[in-house]
Regions:
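Positively charged, small/polar-rich N-terminal and surface patches that mediate targeting and assembly
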Residues: 1-108
């Protein structure tokens, strides 16, 4: 079964803003072992303090792939100096639908 994995990563280390969304994405690509994801900047609260954050959404096409990503999250947290990274793993139906050529569409 496929899964959707959503990470929410704060930009602060302690009370100091340290990262931008683009930097969080670079680290995520390097440390999570994924080749595709969608990211958006947001803000949230951590221990009662407002903090800019990045949400990263990924698709895992199997339970094993989802677990492999989840298992790398503590390393990402360590590299970014985070106490924790919120990780949501939800069952989902994900498929990648490839484009058709114009000729194939006209014949249909």
């Amino acid at each position: 079964m496929s899964k959707t994995i959503v990470l929410t990563v704060g930009h602060n280390v302690g009370n100091n803003p340290m990262f931008k969304t683009s930097e969080i994405c670079d680290y995520a690509a390097d440390y999570l072992g994924v080749e595709a994801f969608t990211a958006s900047q947001c803000f949230g609260m951590w221990q009662g303090e407002r903090e800019d954050s990045t949400r990263i959404e990924m698709c895992a096409l199997s339970d094993d792939e989802a677990e492999a990503i989840r298992a790398r999250v503590p390393l990402l947290a360590q590299v970014l100096g985070q106490q924790a990274i919120m990780c949501e793993i939800r069952p989902d139906h994900v498929e990648f639908i490839e484009r058709e050529t114009v000729a194939a569409i006209k014949q249909a």
